[in-house]
């Protein structure tokens, strides 16, 4: 499973990259056939948004989350 992370108005640090990778590894337990995950993190003033597109054998799954803290947005995104 390949995880791509893109930042819009945010620098993706190594710690943030590792946090995302560890969170999305849990998804493999629920979806054994995940091919690719693309995560986009966006910062606009005080709005933090995390969105992800999972490519699986039978199509795509999309989810997004907005919070005041990026780590909280990522947590909620994975929980969806």
Task: Walk through the language-model features, giving the residues of each.
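N-terminal, polar/charged subdomain of small-to-medium soluble alpha/beta proteins
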Residues: 1-80
């Amino acid at each position: 499973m390949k995880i791509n992370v893109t930042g819009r108005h945010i620098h993706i640090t190594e710690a943030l990259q590792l946090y995302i990778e560890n969170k999305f590894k849990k998804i493999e337990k629920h979806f054994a056939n995940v091919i690719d995950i693309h995560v986009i993190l966006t910062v606009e003033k005080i709005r933090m948004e995390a969105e992800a597109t999972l490519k699986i054998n039978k199509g795509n799954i999309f989810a997004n989350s907005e919070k005041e803290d990026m780590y909280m947005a990522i947590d909620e995104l994975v929980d969806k």
